Amino acid sequence: MATFDLRNTPSVTIPAPVQLRNVVRQFGRQRVIDGLDLDIAAGEFVALLGASGSGKTTLLRTLAGLDSIDSGELRVPVARAAVFQEPRLMPWKSAWKNVVLGLRVNDAKARAHAALTEVGLAHRLNAFPATLSGGEAQRVALARGLVREPKLLLLDEPFAALDALTRIRMHQLIIDLWRKHTPAVLLVTHDVDEAILLADRVIVLADGKIADDIRIDLPRQRDSGQAGFQLIRSRLLGLLGVKGAEPDTAPQASAPDSTFSELRRVASAR
């Protein structure tokens, strides 16, 4: 049997599952995405910030296959799923049937049960959407995405309509599921703190172009009182045009945000 010495074998570079090269999307004369270059690595969590009209949702829809591009090159995994601000559940179908909607497999109910168990809703398997809370409905939508075993998970402001405590619980759930399943994630959000708390990178989009791409090196589990958090926050707010923000000179927080920390403590205890 032949043997091989791999010590001097060059390492193989695995291409990023998401690659955009000079991508353009325009409506009439307006370029909503303007010559965009972007890579998202396997298992990487990226948050996308930007003012209204900056191109965030158009970019997400393009990656989801819901919109086309006018020019450039786009590479995305075939296995991808999207979760939107509205859960988009079929009201006449039970939770488990919503989870496997469009999925043609013999063990559909078993897969739905497994996915709902992962999001803490095994007991709501046969519940109808009208009986679900807002947080429960979003968890069903998340289970619907996970059951497809996506290599790319797209999140379009999925927590925007939730109360503060439910948002924090959903943040932790997303992180737990991301660590377990390791998809690449793109989160579109207007919430700067949310972006810093969850992402490996935060990209700021302006007029269809990347205004900044910031690596978040803060250790997890993150808190707004961590050294460096407020500096990153001020930089992002400055990029978003928030008056009074000083991206390069903002002081770091001297103490944790007590309200935020208390909410996280309560959420973790339940």
Curated annotation (Swiss-Prot):
Enzyme class, spelled out: translocase
Entry keyword Nucleotide-binding: yes
Domain ABC transporter: 18-232
Residues in coiled coil: none
Gene Ontology MF terms: ATP binding; ATP hydrolysis activity
Listed Polar residues bias regions: 251-261
GO cellular component assignments: plasma membrane
Pfam families with a match to the protein in the record: ABC_tran (PF00005)
Localization of this protein: Cell inner membrane
Domain of life: Bacteria
The UniProt record lists the keyword Cell inner membrane: yes
Reactions accelerated catalytically: ATP + H2O + aliphatic sulfonate-[sulfonate-binding protein]Side 1 = ADP + phosphate + aliphatic sulfonateSide 2 + [sulfonate-binding protein]Side 1
Membrane topology type: Peripheral membrane protein
Record keywords: ATP-binding, Cell inner membrane, Cell membrane, Membrane, Nucleotide-binding, Translocase, Transport
Enzyme Commission identifier(s): 7.6.2.14
Chain residue ranges for the region called Disordered: 247-270
Chain residues that bind ATP: 50-57
Summary of the function given for this chain in its UniProt record: Part of the ABC transporter complex SsuABC involved in aliphatic sulfonates import. Responsible for energy coupling to the transport system.
Family: Belongs to the ABC transporter superfamily. Aliphatic sulfonates importer (TC 3.A.1.17.2) family.
PANTHER family registered for this protein in UniProt: ALIPHATIC SULFONATES IMPORT ATP-BINDING PROTEIN SSUB, TAURINE IMPORT ATP-BINDING PROTEIN-RELATED
Complex formation: The complex is composed of two ATP-binding proteins (SsuB), two transmembrane proteins (SsuC) and a solute-binding protein (SsuA).
Protein name, UniProt field: Aliphatic sulfonates import ATP-binding protein SsuB 1
Gene: ssuB1
